[in-house]
Amino acid sequence: MEQKKATVRLMGTIIDMLVTHTHPDAILEEAIRRLRIYEQRFSANDPKSELMQINHLAGKAPLAVHPDLFHLIKVGKYHSLAPNSRLNIAIGPLVQTWRIGFGDAKVPDAEEIQRLLEITDPNKILLSEKDQTVFLQQEGMSIDLGALAKGYIADLLTDYFKKAGVASALINLGGNVVVFGPSQNNEDPYWRIGIQNPMLPRAHYSAVLKIQNQSAVTSGVYERQLEAQGKHYHHILDPQTGYPAETDVISLTVVADDSVDGEIWTTRLFGQ
């Protein structure tokens, strides 16, 4: 068995993968191939992605989609409709208007935010189990899976690694960390996962987790920000107001068996 690492930039983030296998290069090459497919399926920033095809057809027609995409939208809708949830996968129009984290980010005026809030109702995402179709009832609606997709993709990669006979692995998908199998670098089998101190530069940790066969997901207001007219705006939007969530929380970490659950709950609970 040999341990190898690969780093690739996809989905607007840095992805690190570390695997232990008899043929680690082939495993990592296939993982990168799959990541490119997942990006084409789940991205809200690629106009040609399968998700964006749904959004382009908003108010016009349903679209039959890949089972993975259908499942993730179904899960996202369920958690978007939960009482007091900060997660709303129909928040796409607001995310694309604020554009926090991109070069063209701006603060929308209050009237525009109110107008966009009217097309962010997750109840108007219609799903057909029988046909595996997704239909957005109102023109202008758009789904954004940014609060779910990285975790879900990390879980898909983990499943692939296990089926391919990988003995142990670490996946760091833009802050979504998944580990399974024994760590090859410590005396005990547990992996050490550092939690970034949001007040200090990279690689300064406020805590170090010891985990195995689990995922650690961190959401924070310090990652992507917009400064305008002397105010700082972070990228985690409150689906009730359309503005960045007002909170004293800077960073929230959830440890879960599945990475997608960690993503769901960091978003649902952020600022509460």
Q: Which residues does each predicted region cover?
A:
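Mature catalytic core of soluble alpha/beta enzymes
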Residues: M1-Q272
